């Protein structure tokens, strides 16, 4: 069968996408193979499969394919985390509506349709990338079969006392008009003004948020601050307001910030919440859910926060209370979605209890890769100041399965058998357990999207009737440790009392070629389709493999190009191999025919197998692909294949069979080594010389019979000798296949095989085990004109002629002693050896030779 010379990645990929069957990757609960269950991240269906997705899923696919080839029954599911604000915004934009303009169920229907379209686009890209996903295990969180389980988890945690409703300060996004969790706050660096404001003559505070002055409920100083501790207990009037507050002491006040005097507002930040709780202060909330100040702000009521800031500063100036303003660097808490500065306001919300110590103890029982990523979770958990707020003021999300009795206000949470349920559309089938009323108001708040995605390991294992648990692996990015990883551990403990996975592998983010975060405004965004269109999927997958797990990775076109070139190289190796083994069937007898070079490369190849297996087991895909490529290109193609070509073309039948055995074996092993990383190329190569799919084969294991230290030494020596002779020919301007008179090789290794040295150098070869006596004589002394010319000027030529006429013995004495006396126009002149370059000739046993030294041998080229 004729095989084209150039590897066409697009043609190959298109071919196998049509031929591969989904059933190849279906997970069977009844399989007797050991199970390996991957809790894959369900992406948000934006419709665009970005480069970060490509990286994440490549890593997952490397693991899934590797584990399958090692005899595991692998579950690689695909989910879609659908609910959330971005879809609501896109639907509002698409249809030119606001969510309140149409019935809730109609708005949700539009969101579902929009999301289904996006899922279809992303599903197509995932298939195009060759990911070995079990599509029979696909889940979509917006469908009742999934969100009914989210609701079930809510009910069970509520019944365990782990979910409760309370009036408490929460983080609120005025633009999105919903609460968000602490983990969803993004801090953005910027510039702001630190305002120095006089409350009383001796009370001056410094604040970045003057608009919250009407919410000031106390002034605080550090108890040991010599400048300000005399103020403790003093009553102070709050400027621009009718309020009076007390100065209190607290150790958490930073005496070095501003004036060392701070105002406590309800609420400027999380520190205010801590102080409010600790000192049992008054609650005066002045910011509404729309981001405007309310009636408690007095004359500033109805203003937006920026408007109130300007108005209050203007009033302070008029009253002479604004002493100065200083520009400072400032971190502002913003909404993770819309980047609007968030506010902390008190509200009646649903919360999940966060049991910090239990979560951290469980997290320690999980293997973290890299290990240091655990500390990120630990730092986040320790920094949490209140429980997880799970209610959101949106529509497109899992409904909270609860009602409120209109008669007595009793909260009625759904029973398990009522699920799934939308409380805004359905009344509970039973009367109020407290007063017997049948009049209810359905909960209009919905659940945080993380309530859906934090039960993914439970869902894929059949919860609530678990078939197996925990899962084996959670692969995810470091950017969602404090959300997805944290919430999943919390929920798994709450619902099943177990860790969700045995191991968690954390990958990094993808940055542009300029080393910065990808952004349309920076013009450094790369999409997977662009890479695939130019160089194919496997080249992109090799790039993904080049990143170190846990580290951020820079997208670099040169890495993709190098990957593409390697594929062409491997394809050329495959073509060369198939050309020679088309009529060959390996046999055990052929092993007896192996020569030094054969045993060398087989030993090196098996050591490569051991090295790659170790790297793959440790998720060091970067080291694995590097080792495979280095061996394949340099050891195997550039050296072994070049060494045995003469044997393949001109050798005896036995010599050919030995080489063909190696070619067949090496192509088999290398193709299987590459299969998890370059599935298309591996399948195409495999199909030309083996039956079935390479992805249904076993991953290579080290075959001890081929490990041979003596052969490795011999092979390295042969490689060095051939390389030295080739360089000699190149330097002499000879063709690489030009014959040489004879090579005499001194080697300390007993029985070094000369067949392949002779064939690769096109020369007669003699091996000697004792170093020959090398005689060296001066053939010529080349003058260094740059030295002699300036020293002797018009007599330089005479000096050079005089030295040239010296006898061989005199020339050798000059080199040995460093200087001799020479007669120059009747005068004795000292001539130094350093003025000349000695050209010598070597000989052994009377034969003139060129001597080439390698690391392990000496080669004499007879001339």
From Swiss-Prot:
GO terms for molecular function: aminoacyl-tRNA deacylase activity; ATP binding; valine-tRNA ligase activity. ATP binds at residue 520. It comes from the Archaea. The keyword Cytoplasm applies. It is found in: Cytoplasm. Gene3D superfamilies: HUPs (3.40.50.620), Isoleucyl-tRNA Synthetase, Domain 1 (1.10.730.10). A motif ('HIGH' region) lies at residues 43-53. The keyword Membrane does not apply. Its main location: cytoplasm. Its EC number is 6.1.1.9. It catalyses: tRNA(Val) + L-valine + ATP = L-valyl-tRNA(Val) + AMP + diphosphate. Keywords: Aminoacyl-tRNA synthetase, ATP-binding, Cytoplasm, Ligase, Nucleotide-binding, Protein biosynthesis. A motif ('KMSKS' region) lies at residues 517-521. It holds the Pfam family tRNA-synt_1. GO terms for cellular component: cytosol. GO terms for biological process: valyl-tRNA aminoacylation. InterPro entries: aa-tRNA-synth_I_CS, aa-tRNA-synth_Ia, Anticodon_Ia_Val, M/V/L/I-tRNA-synth_anticd-bd, Rossmann-like_a/b/a_fold, tRNAsynth_Ia_anticodon-bd, Val/Leu/Ile-tRNA-synth_edit, Valine-tRNA_ligase_type_2. Catalyzes the attachment of valine to tRNA(Val). As ValRS can inadvertently accommodate and process structurally similar amino acids such as threonine, to avoid such errors, it has a 'posttransfer' editing activity that hydrolyzes mischarged Thr-tRNA(Val) in a tRNA-dependent manner. ValRS has two distinct active sites: one for aminoacylation and one for editing. The misactivated threonine is translocated from the active site to the editing site. Belongs to the class-I aminoacyl-tRNA synthetase family. ValS type 2 subfamily. This is Valine--tRNA ligase.
